[in-house]
Amino acid sequence: MTTYLVPCGLSILNWMRAYSSGDPNKRYANIDPAAVEDLLDEQEQWRSNEKRELNVWKSTVLEKARAADVEHWDPRVSAETSTLRARRPGGPLITDEDRIVLLASDTDEGISAALCVAAVVAAGNPGRIDGIAEPEDELPPGKATVVRIDGLKPTSLSLGRACEAMGTVLHNALATGPSERIEVHLTGGYKAALLHMLAMTEVAYSRFPSRVSAHYIFEGDGRSATGHDKAVRIGLRRFPRGQLIRMREELSYAKRGLPMRGTPMFEGLAWEKYGDRTRLTDFGRGYLAVLGGTWTPGTNDGGGL
């Protein structure tokens, strides 16, 4: 079983708009532009509805996706499907042995884009689309799940909440089983968050180096994704186990505002002094989530370390 964590941006919506308007550079397949335009219109109507129920989306937007022959769309329609196809050059993008988790920004357009990516990943099959989940929710196998990342939006003053949410998703993915692999794909998504996601992936990799990997593909090289653009594996740094234990302890003290024990190792990197108090940086909030959350002194809660 492999869990694919894929930060999701707006590239698929941008492609659909360009394709439906007749942009010759976006003609990756013989699809009726009018059908793509109908799909866009249906997605916009669903997005403007206050309830935005998933069952309604499946019965309206997904039906339009099938009418637009989404099953045969070239993976280049989005950064997310391009990177998945590069890692899965043959067969369907998702099987019973996979979990595909699309990390969506905290905006209506971000959710819309992620659901459209899910439609392509699932080849229009509603049974392969789990729905819109919270970071702490269980990740079902054999399905594409959209996770809305709280605070991941242009109006946010920091990425602290978003890092904590993404770290929680990573922690839950690690908890799925001792033999299950986790691939983090960093080709698409909200650019400001990719660096934070990479840093958190290094903490996850430090915990389970045989299970965790990160990948990306170069954009705009002009080759067909159906010809299998090469997915490049990112070399990840690794913290020794003792440093991970110390990191969780130190960040827990900083979050609670308690005096540090011993010489600080992660001041400036994951926490900082703020007047006479301490607070976690955005990176620190993500690190602590990956490590299992706040550690309580005097307990044997190891967070799986």
Each model region followed by its residue ranges:
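A short helix-loop-helix "switch/interaction" segment in the helical subdomain of ASCE P-loop NTPases
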Residues: H185-T187
